[in-house]
Curated annotation (Swiss-Prot):
<dbReference type="InterPro" id="IPR017911">
    <property type="entry name" value="MacB-like_ATP-bd"/>
</dbReference>
<comment type="similarity">
    <text>Belongs to the ABC transporter superfamily. Lipoprotein translocase (TC 3.A.1.125) family.</text>
</comment>
<keyword id="KW-0472">Membrane</keyword>
<dbReference type="Pfam" id="PF00005">
    <property type="entry name" value="ABC_tran"/>
</dbReference>
<keyword id="KW-0067">ATP-binding</keyword>
<dbReference type="InterPro" id="IPR027417">
    <property type="entry name" value="P-loop_NTPase"/>
</dbReference>
<keyword id="KW-0997">Cell inner membrane</keyword>
<dbReference type="GO" id="GO:0005886">
    <property type="term" value="C:plasma membrane"/>
</dbReference>
<comment type="function">
    <text>Part of the ABC transporter complex LolCDE involved in the translocation of mature outer membrane-directed lipoproteins, from the inner membrane to the periplasmic chaperone, LolA. Responsible for the formation of the LolA-lipoprotein complex in an ATP-dependent manner.</text>
</comment>
<dbReference type="GO" id="GO:0044874">
    <property type="term" value="P:lipoprotein localization to outer membrane"/>
</dbReference>
<keyword id="KW-0547">Nucleotide-binding</keyword>
<protein>
    <recommendedName>
        <fullName>Lipoprotein-releasing system ATP-binding protein LolD</fullName>
        <ecNumber>7.6.2.-</ecNumber>
    </recommendedName>
</protein>
<feature type="domain" description="ABC transporter">
    <location>
        <begin position="9"/>
        <end position="228"/>
    </location>
</feature>
<dbReference type="InterPro" id="IPR017871">
    <property type="entry name" value="ABC_transporter-like_CS"/>
</dbReference>
<keyword id="KW-0813">Transport</keyword>
<keyword id="KW-1278">Translocase</keyword>
<dbReference type="GO" id="GO:0089705">
    <property type="term" value="P:protein localization to outer membrane"/>
</dbReference>
């Protein structure tokens, strides 16, 4: 367990509004190893996305702990959490969240520029990552000029540009047709082998989840089943 990349123990999340309490996560515990491809499958409202937010330090648990490379993530300062998110964790969402007025290359380079990298170096690295995701012919295209699958490829490139240890992907193929979704999952497997980056993917699609190393099922805030692919 000490060599695990990401570990959570007894994670609970309770939302309170007036006199109403809603327990979304009910004591979730598991570990992700370096370079592992893991899926979390469950229906809408089962707690999958909430869990991902806690693991990425985008929200605080009501109880329990998250450890990243042996460090307790949820007890760190906001600045330390932000540093780990920027340098160690990539994020991909159902909607690509690309900047409409910028090219694919500029969107991918943006995290590097924000981190202080020189423009020429940032653009060179962005191009190399776009090459990796099969978009060497789309450097200068804006999001409106790309297909849905190409936009998600750019989103994955942006998530990978800082060489993160893990990418957290929340329904990354939810807006795509089945054929394109399969291509995106094949891309994740390819990137995992080439870069060594671990992936934790939230999805409701069992067929797509089966393409990864391990599949965990969530139901009503509980991790109820673990399967090895």
């Amino acid at each position: 367990m000490s060599n695990s990349l990401l570990v959570c123990h007894g994670l609970r999340k309770i939302y309170r509004e007036a006199q109403l309490e809603t327990e979304v996560l009910k004591g979730v515990s598991f570990a992700i190893e370096p370079n592992e491809l893991v899926a979390i499958v469950g229906s809408s409202g089962s707690g999958k996305s909430t869990l991902l937010h806690l693991l990425g330090a985008l929200d605080e648990p009501s109880d329990g702990d998250v450890f990243f490379k042996g460090q307790k993530l949820n007890s760190m300062s906001a600045n330390k959490q932000a540093k780990i998110r920027n340098q160690e964790i990539g994020f991909v969402y159902q909607f690509h969240h690309l900047l409409a007025d910028f090219s694919a290359m500029e969107n991918v380079a943006m995290p590097l520029l924000i981190g202080g990298m020189a423009t020429d170096k940032a653009e060179s690295k962005a191009k190399s990552i776009l090459d990796m995701v099969g978009l060497s012919h789309r450097y200068e295209h804006r999001p409106s000029e790309l297909s849905g699958g190409e936009r998600q490829r750019v989103a994955f490139a942006r998530a990978l540009v800082n060489n993160p240890s893990i990418v957290l992907a929340d329904e990354p193929t939810g807006n795509l047709d089945h054929k394109t979704a399969l291509e995106i999952y094949d891309l994740m497997c390819k990137l995992n082998k080439e870069s060594g980056t671990a992936f934790l993917v939230v999805t409701h699609d069992n067929e797509l989840a089966a393409k990864l190393d391990r599949c965990m099922h969530m139901q009503d805030g509980n991790l109820v089943q673990v399967e090895v692919a």
